[in-house]
Amino acid sequence: MNDPTIAIEIETTSSTKRVGLLGVLTLLAITAAAILHVNQPEFILDRFEGISELEYSLFDTTLYSSYLIIGITTGLLSDRWAKRRVFVLVGATGSILFYWLMTTTLSYPILLLYRFLQGSFTVMAWQTFMTLAIDFSESHNRGRNMGIFGAFLALAMGLGPAVGGVIASFGVFIPYYTAMGLNVLVLTIGLVALRDPPMTKTRPTLKQSFMLARTSPELIVPGIFNLFDRLHIGFILTALPFFLSTMLGLDESLRGLSLAIFALPFIILQYPMGKLSDRYGRFRQLVVGSIGYGVVLSVVGIVGLLGFNLLLVMLAILGLFSGVTSPPAMALIGDIVGQEDSAMGMGFFNFLGNLGITIGPILFGVIMPILGMSNAFVVVGLLELATLVVNILLVRTVFKDRIT
């Protein structure tokens, strides 16, 4: 009667429900953060006079730096204390507080402090959701559970800007109040439905992840791809709303539409592009996607000045190439290190990605005043192509026949 197959099926169903709940919580938390990007020009430039492009870019750089620093700290503490739920509850509560405080200050340095703290509490919650998804998964259901979790995460990234564009038209602070409400839901659901797992799985430390890069130096190839892909995401999330507002004079709803059109192909292509890379190889797909992404990104600023409709077409194509490159870069980690070291490999991969998305807004703030808006897109597009050349040289010389 004690059929192990039935036991596995029951456990799989139970863990899938838990991961589904974590996915919903992630959808709420990430959507809350994503809806703020669309009306940043009004929220910052209209409230704080004399803000330079570099100072403007610090609003997002501060957020991503908190993700980089507190994300690591949260992982270490949650493993050491073998606790998860408390980080979700504290994270949601802190997010509510600092989303509100950002609407109250008229000092830009204080706003940046609140932004850092808001990001710290936000990443505390959603990174714990990701850790819990791993805790509730075993080898026989990990792939499916990560697919479910990833679908909610991607949906939030695409849904946030679209929703933000609509609600921002009702008032500059409405996205922030909405973010507070979404985190109230996270806090309530966390209190009622979330429990710590009976056994927690220890995640690798950052030091362990970088030690793995010494024994498996091929990791630098997907790491470079992720570093610059995320750098471009950070650049686009800062530069595009600014460009649409100051250069084209578009309102919040159209800015939200633009970001959603960029995100939609990326979301849709995650699964099919992953399957395609299984069949035809990772690196070839990364080369094709990176060439297309770099070329299109280079001309976005120029084409955008010719008309909004043309810009939307270019953003859709850009999102398509972004969707082509993301799955094979992540899959390369598993190819290189194997399942037993995949967590450490992903730690290295994600650290470089978080570093890239932190640098992206700063790059916009530095380049734009010197070269202008359109040329800033040219520079970051050429940067994509230059890093692709570096990776091609690495794969054909240093790592020949070790990456396909």
What are these regions (language model features)?
Residues 70-82, 270-281, 368:
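Helix-to-loop junctions at the C-terminal end of transmembrane segments
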Residues 86-100, 284-299:
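Structural signature of the two symmetry-related core transmembrane helices
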Residues 13-64, 221, 230-248:
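Helix-loop boundary and gating motifs at the non-cytosolic
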Residues 175-191, 377-392:
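Symmetry-related core transmembrane helices of the 12-TM Major Facilitator Superfamily/SLC fold
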Residues 2-16, 195-225:
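Juxtamembrane intracellular "pre-TM" segments in multi-pass secondary transporters
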Residues 116-152, 332:
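Cytoplasmic helix-loop-helix junction between adjacent transmembrane helices
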Residues 44-45, 77-78, 163-169, 244-245, ...:
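Interfacial helix-cap and linker-helix signal at transmembrane-aqueous boundaries
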Residues 109-117, 309-317:
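Paired small-residue
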